[in-house]
């Protein structure tokens, strides 16, 4: 696990956006795993700006979103398909036919989950998976007690997650309690994982994910198993890490190493 601690949410978004942009420059036909919620919005704004400035293209990109509410059509303003269209897809040069969000209105949700897994595999797997983290350590809609090798499936949301997401729904509006989500095993299959977290409300979850035991009680702790997981967090989200100064030291040494390697490559 690479732990990157930055000053604030703006720096976190900038770092994450640059990582994705560099991925697309290396591999223009990358397969991106994308996330919703408040955390990635600033990152998406930076991707839109870079695309509109001609700094990066999404023409060859295929994308798969982590999750979707079960029971909402893609045209519903609170659906994650609507979120992705309005926050990113409609503003960049991506082929919308190559953007995938689990179908919240599927007649047969079980079959839809199996088909989603097959689509990811047919695309060659996910090159970089973007994640947020819930206060209870959930990633996607993999709530505590989720199997660490689980695949895309229907999940019941915890009351804590329902309450966290209630701010996105109008008073009295129907709020789903079920979702379709990539499983933890599906997420771990990605070649690289990028998790962003900001704010003191995420500090306990970050501590459990990074320094706690590998446990289904904190789904994000499964990232300890990943060969290339990068956690980019601000000072507030890092505030409860016992070894945060050590993580800063490791990252500083890593940056020096990368600079040396770049200099050697430039001198070839």
From Swiss-Prot:
HAMAP family, per the entry: GlcN6P_deamin
Active-site residue list: 67, 136, 138, 143
Family: Belongs to the glucosamine/galactosamine-6-phosphate isomerase family. NagB subfamily.
Listed PANTHER family: GLUCOSAMINE-6-PHOSPHATE ISOMERASE
SUPFAM superfamilies recorded: NagB/RpiA/CoA transferase-like
Domain of life: Bacteria
GO CC annotations, alphabetized: cytoplasm
Source organism: Shewanella loihica (strain ATCC BAA-1088 / PV-4)
Subunit structure, as described in the record: Homohexamer.
Disulfide topology: none
Pfam family, one: Glucosamine_iso
Pathway given in the UniProt record: Amino-sugar metabolism; N-acetylneuraminate degradation; D-fructose 6-phosphate from N-acetylneuraminate: step 5/5
MF annotations from Gene Ontology: glucosamine-6-phosphate deaminase activity; identical protein binding
NCBIfam families, per database record: nagB, PRK00443.1-4
Primary role: Catalyzes the reversible isomerization-deamination of glucosamine 6-phosphate (GlcN6P) to form fructose 6-phosphate (Fru6P) and ammonium ion.
This protein's UniProt keywords: Carbohydrate metabolism, Hydrolase
InterPro entries reported for this sequence: Glc/Gal-6P_isomerase (IPR006148), Glucosamine6P_isomerase (IPR004547), Glucosamine6P_isomerase_CS (IPR018321), NagB/RpiA_transferase-like (IPR037171)
GO biological process, one term: glucosamine catabolic process
Entry's EC annotation: 3.5.99.6
Stated name of the protein: Glucosamine-6-phosphate deaminase
